[in-house]
């Protein structure tokens, strides 16, 4: 293409993404938009087309972002090129959302006509405003009997401060209002700015590993043009590659000769190493590089850590490969090797949150067929020692001796919880039980409240979300952000089996709840660990002090079965001999800890 053609094409490009709270219907809306623009034949159409992972389809949530190019003939008779970038809505995947928004000029804000605005709707809107996107409100599910579009329209204006007078009333399921949405995108979303003659700048917003073509980078071209055969350079790592193919997604990958300003597509350059394409990096030409990289989004720091160990220790290397491949598509995952006396070799992994952790675990078990044992999740603590040094602890077994500790600080988050009036009491109770500090309470309208609490991250990690959902019948929604570290009275609790410490069961707990927690775990382990030939004491200790104990009784053979009547001293002799044997066994015997026992430590708040 020459310069004029490129400029004309650029004026017809519209890049947008869809943002919404979980379950407000954004994947269905994406399906309807694909149908309306005839991106697919009827035969290829299936529900939630852009959720390509099995896991996404099963759980009905979007995890990875996805990009599609669509052609749309608008009412003004012109052909427009729309790039739809689908985003997840769950709080753990905010970083996926911030990546997709960085590649767009506009966003469709989907709000459920029955439920109104929820916590993540707000969080995502603020992300969109930070990226200076044009926001088009759409009120979805208007065909529901409980829909109240006018109230929701008012809510959008009051809570978010967007002008909702032209908000489209739609039902993605019934296909109502889809055309209006497309027309609004064409009218209101600005065309991409940028110059096709400038040095190349492409933003990598995702990547994928293909065993035949190497790493495939998903890119948005901001300036310049990239063709097959160009030599390109990654600005963060400085590595250079020759482009082997470029193209776009029309959900399927379709090869093109070149990508130019405003295009959203993919680039392959036989990149072998996963670490060479960092998401958020800028690609430029090797011969004529751009002066500086694009302002990528920030690198996210993991909040939750846990150990992953293969059940079969021979598969340690397979687990490393699996983690490396997942890390490629998931820039927020971090891992490093660690060893445990109880579990052998494995990895300490960092995640954004519990859902993220669960999904990575499930993907490893599913896609790579490796059975895993996971240890209790923990957060990063700062430990200040009496000699003036300080250290960072992300694994309870690295906690120093309590005598040497001056104070321990833990990360706190500011949690904004949106909840209907009727459940305010229940939510406050949960937050207080989780050592939360009440900060603020605001009424959004007559029926909904936003509560703000400061809560230690370690309390949210366990099962805060599950409790919140179950105690508010699923109506509460919440969003959190880190606010920094504060001192807390924390102690490390060890579990001893047969007076040997099991390092994988150690955890860090607040001193006030240590006794109860210890008691619960000890009882739970007693149920789960199979009986041995000798008796096994289970103890929960803090430092050298035992706070809870329980004993698994020994199994014993009836050694008196063969004595009919007979002298008591004969029986004594047999019983003493048995006792002697059990004692010897106890001094050398070791106890197998089943996988359920490790899981029990995670789920101990259930009772």
Swiss-Prot record:
Similarity section: Belongs to the TRAFAC class translation factor GTPase superfamily. Classic translation factor GTPase family. LepA subfamily.
Amino-acid positions noted as binding GTP in the UniProt annotation, renumbered to this chain: 23-28, 140-143
A Gene Ontology molecular function term of the record: translation elongation factor activity
EC top class named in words: hydrolase
Organism: Bacillus cereus (strain Q1)
Matching Gene3D superfamilies: 3.30.70.240, Elongation factor 4, C-terminal domain, Elongation Factor G (Translational Gtpase), domain 3, P-loop containing nucleotide triphosphate hydrolases, Translation factors
GO annotation, cellular component aspect: plasma membrane
Reactions catalysed: GTP + H2O = GDP + phosphate + H(+)
Name assigned to this protein: Elongation factor 4
Localization (cell): Cell membrane
InterPro entries listed in its UniProt record: EF-4 (IPR006297), EFG_III/V (IPR035647), EFG_V-like (IPR000640), EFTu-like_2 (IPR004161), G_TR_CS (IPR031157), LepA_C_sf (IPR038363), LepA_CTD (IPR013842), LepA_IV (IPR035654)
EC number: 3.6.5.n1
Protein encoded by which gene: lepA
């Amino acid at each position: 293409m020459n310069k004029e053609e490129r400029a004309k094409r650029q004026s017809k490009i519209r890049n947008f993404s869809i943002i919404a709270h979980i379950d407000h219907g954004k994947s269905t809306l994406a399906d309807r938009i694909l149908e309306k623009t005839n991106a697919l034949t009827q035969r290829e159409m299936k529900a939630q087309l852009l959720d390509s992972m099995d896991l996404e389809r099963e759980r009905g949530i979007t995890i990875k972002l996805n990009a599609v190019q669509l052609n749309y003939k608008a009412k003004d008779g012109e052909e427009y090129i729309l790039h739809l970038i689908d985003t997840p809505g769950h709080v753990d995947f905010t970083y996926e959302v911030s990546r997709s928004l960085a590649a767009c000029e506009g966003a469709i804000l989907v709000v459920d006509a029955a439920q109104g605005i929820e916590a993540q709707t707000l969080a995502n809107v603020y992300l969109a405003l930070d990226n200076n996107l044009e926001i088009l409100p759409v009120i979805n599910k208007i065909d529901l009997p409980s829909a109240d579009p006018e109230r929701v329209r008012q809510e959008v204006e009051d809570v978010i401060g967007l002008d909702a007078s032209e908000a489209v009333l739609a039902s993605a399921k019934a296909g109502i209002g889809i055309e209006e949405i497309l027309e609004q995108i064409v009218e209101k979303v600005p065309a991409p700015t940028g110059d096709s003659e400038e040095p190349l700048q492409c933003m990598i917003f995702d990547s994928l590993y293909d065993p035949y073509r190497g790493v495939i980078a998903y890119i948005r071209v901001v300036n310049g043009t990239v063709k097959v055969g160009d030599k390109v350079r990654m600005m963060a790592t400085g590595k250079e590659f020759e482009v082997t193919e470029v193209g776009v997604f029309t959900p399927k990958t379709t090869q093109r000769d070149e990508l130019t300003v405003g295009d959203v597509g993919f680039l392959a350059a036989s990149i072998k190493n996963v670490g060479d394409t960092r998401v958020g990096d800028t690609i430029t030409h090797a011969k004529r590089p751009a002066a500086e990289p694009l302002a990528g989004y920030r690198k996210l720091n993991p909040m939750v850590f846990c150990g992953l160990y293969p059940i079969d220790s021979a598969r340690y290397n397979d687990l490393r490969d699996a983690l490396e491949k997942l890390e490629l598509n998931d820039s927020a995952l971090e891992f490093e090797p660690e060893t445990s006396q109880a579990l052998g070799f494995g990895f300490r992994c960092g995640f954004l949150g519990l859902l993220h952790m669960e999904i990575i675990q499930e993907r490893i078990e599913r896609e790579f067929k490796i059975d895993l044992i996971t240890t209790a999740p923990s957060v990063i603590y700062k430990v200040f020692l009496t000699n003036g040094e300080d250290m960072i602890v992300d694994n309870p077994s690295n906690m120093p001796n309590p005598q040497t500790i001056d104070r321990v600080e833990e990360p706190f988050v500011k949690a904004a919880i949106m909840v209907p009036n009727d459940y305010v009491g229940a939510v406050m109770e949960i937050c207080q039980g989780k050592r939360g500090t009440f900060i603020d309470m605001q009424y959004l309208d007559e029926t909904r409240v936003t509560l703000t609490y400061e809560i230690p991250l370690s309390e949210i990690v366990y099962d805060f979300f599950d409790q919140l959902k179950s105690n508010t019948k699923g109506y509460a929604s919440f969003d959190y952000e880190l606010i920094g570290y504060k001192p807390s009275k924390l102690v490390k609790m060890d579990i001893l089996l047969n007076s040997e410490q099991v390092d994988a069961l150690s955890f860090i707990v607040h001193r006030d709840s240590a006794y109860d927690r210890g008691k619960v775990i000890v009882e739970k382990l007693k149920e789960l660990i199979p009986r041995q030939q000798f008796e096994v004491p289970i103890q929960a200790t803090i430092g050298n002090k035992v706070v809870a104990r329980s004993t698994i009784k020994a199994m014993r053979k009836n050694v008196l079965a063969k004595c009919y009547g007979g002298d008591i001293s004969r029986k004594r002799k047999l019983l003493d001999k048995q006792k002697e044997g059990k004692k010897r066994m106890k001094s050398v015997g070791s106890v197998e800890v089943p996988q359920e026992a490790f899981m029990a430590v995670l789920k101990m708040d259930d009772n």
